[in-house]
Amino acid sequence: MTRSVWLKADDAVGDWEARKRRITAGLEAGVDWVLVDERDVSRVRELGQVNVAAFAGDDVHVMDAEEQPDAEPDAVIVGKEGEGDGTVDLPSDFSGSADLTTLRRAEAPAGAYVRILDQDYESFAETAAVDADYTIVIGDDWQIIPLENLIARIGDETDLIAGVQTAEEAETAFETLELGADAVLLDTDNPDEIRATVEARDATERETLDLQRATVTEIEETGSADRVCVDTASMLEHDEGMLVGSMSRGLFFVHAETADSPYVASRPFRVNAGAVHAYVRTPDGGTKYLAELSSGDEVQVVDTDGNTREAIVGRAKIEKRPMFRIEAELENGDRIETLLQNAETIKVATDEGRRSVTELEAGDELLIYYEDVARHFGEAVEESIIEK
């Protein structure tokens, strides 16, 4: 499931300048959607590239794209100043609902906006979800139980979006009933909360890897090869690096160049990852050859505890350098290997801490990631492949 963050920026926020500040903070943080009133759609388009949803006015007909394409929202949301938010009383029979009728007649992708004031509004949200592409539910005195009920009952019929005001509430919404909400609608002016909510979204998509130890059985100089430095567009932490190796089933943890050295300045955005043939792990759980990497690609950054995040490649620098071949054995007897540059600045994670490859000896234990699968074009396949 891909989560998303919506940012509420309608007239309830304030005048256009107040709304603009909120939207700008959202764009800078990386929100996925902005929810505004219809009249602000083109204004949002001018501020940056983002999905724009608009509350429906009296007429939900979307303007002809040839007349004013920037004014057409990506989704129309029904329920503000109607039955959904309690402005108009709910009908006893939902078949007579004006909001639901409007929702069904909408020409664009459409969503429902419902404040959960009591169980009747829960039922109304469930009914709306049958026809809605998006179902936004707001709890004024928010409780987990209504959200759990809706997650359990609605299923995959719609994208369920929970209204929140803080990043902490967003984390809870994303984790409720393990499945969690598909998205959150954030209502805050605080740039820190907006950034933290986006980070909470990203965290739900990230995997935690089960790293293990392998014992060095052999290390030897091999001569020169084409080596790849992966220069990311992110500053990496001292305990972070990448997973690389000659064999897709077993990847070695190689530290980023965050440590000071008497020989060269630190490069905390860089991982000296190995030879061009080697695999590097990507955020989707796949692999790429180091030789394939280019500016704009995504690679997976991992720390020594197995926590992961994404980084954009700014540059892949290939140069001919002297190399070591490192072989290590796992507890199951399988042996894996890789080529790393023969230089003091390239460090791996051992059982005794960070160590330069020039100081490695047989018997040292290295941090690695192992999965007993074969790969074809970077994707795991159920096939017998011999790598040696």
From Swiss-Prot:
Which reaction is recorded as catalysed by this protein? Answer: 2-amino-2,3,7-trideoxy-D-lyxo-hept-6-ulosonate + NAD(+) + H2O = 3-dehydroquinate + NH4(+) + NADH + H(+)
Q: Where is the signal peptide?
A: none
Instruction: Report the coiled-coil segments.
Output: none
> The organism sits in which domain of life?
Archaea
Keyword Ribonucleoprotein, does the record have it? no
Assigned EC number = 1.4.1.24
Instruction: Give yes or no: UniProt keyword Amino-acid biosynthesis.
Output: yes
| Recorded GO MF terms | 3-dehydroquinate synthase activity; dehydroquinate synthase activity; NAD binding
UniProt keyword list: Amino-acid biosynthesis, Aromatic amino acid biosynthesis, NAD, Oxidoreductase
GO BP annotations, alphabetical order? amino acid biosynthetic process; aromatic amino acid family biosynthetic process
Q: Main role?
A: Catalyzes the oxidative deamination and cyclization of 2-amino-3,7-dideoxy-D-threo-hept-6-ulosonic acid (ADH) to yield 3-dehydroquinate (DHQ), which is fed into the canonical shikimic pathway of aromatic amino acid biosynthesis.
The UniProt family comment states:
Belongs to the archaeal-type DHQ synthase family.
The record, for PANTHER family, names:
3-DEHYDROQUINATE SYNTHASE (PTHR33563:SF1), PTHR33563
State the protein's name: 3-dehydroquinate synthase
Could you tell me which species this protein originates from? Natronomonas pharaonis (strain ATCC 35678 / DSM 2160 / CIP 103997 / JCM 8858 / NBRC 14720 / NCIMB 2260 / Gabara) (Halobacterium pharaonis)
User: Which gene name belongs to this protein?
Assistant: aroB'
